[in-house]
């Protein structure tokens, strides 16, 4: 039987609420595989950059960064990521808006277009979270796995 509490389902292995980050990639752009991977990495790291860079000291040490319980659990745990796909910019932006409405961290990536897209800045992907699965799933749970 699954162990649950009032805040949501718990992971059977750790007894903690499961956490993840979901990377949403636009497939209509037909990016090269390496480009897709790089864009997804940019999306994932955008969260960390936003949280840490403002707290860097002149010596380059992140001082006084405060992570939520979910963020700390994700960082201390598996750093689990799930990649899903959408078929258009409109679908990508709909996920972005849905995450904002749900109060879940979301980071939209716009590629500068230097190596693909003919020099045109192009929205390629986004990252939702990290957060608890039960907060992210209402935002991305209906999207197809990549």
Question: Which ranges hold each PLM region?
Answer:
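Positively charged, small/polar-rich N-terminal and surface patches that mediate targeting and assembly
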Residues: 1-146
């Amino acid at each position: 039987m699954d162990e649950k509490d009032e805040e949501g389902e718990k992971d059977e292995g750790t007894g903690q609420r499961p956490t993840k980050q979901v990377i949403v990639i636009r497939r209509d752009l037909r990016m090269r595989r390496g480009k897709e991977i790089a864009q997804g990495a940019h999306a994932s790291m955008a969260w960390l950059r936003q949280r840490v860079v403002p707290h860097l000291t002149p010596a380059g040490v992140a001082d006084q960064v405060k992570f939520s319980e979910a963020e700390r659990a994700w960082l201390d745990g598996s750093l689990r990521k799930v990649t899903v796909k959408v078929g258009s910019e409109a679908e990508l932006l709909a996920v972005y808006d849905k995450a904002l409405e749900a109060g879940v961290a979301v980071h939209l990536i716009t590629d500068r277009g230097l190596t693909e897209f003919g020099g045109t800045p192009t929205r390629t992907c986004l990252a939702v979270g990290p957060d608890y699965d039960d907060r992210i799933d209402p935002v991305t749970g209906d999207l197809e796995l990549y």
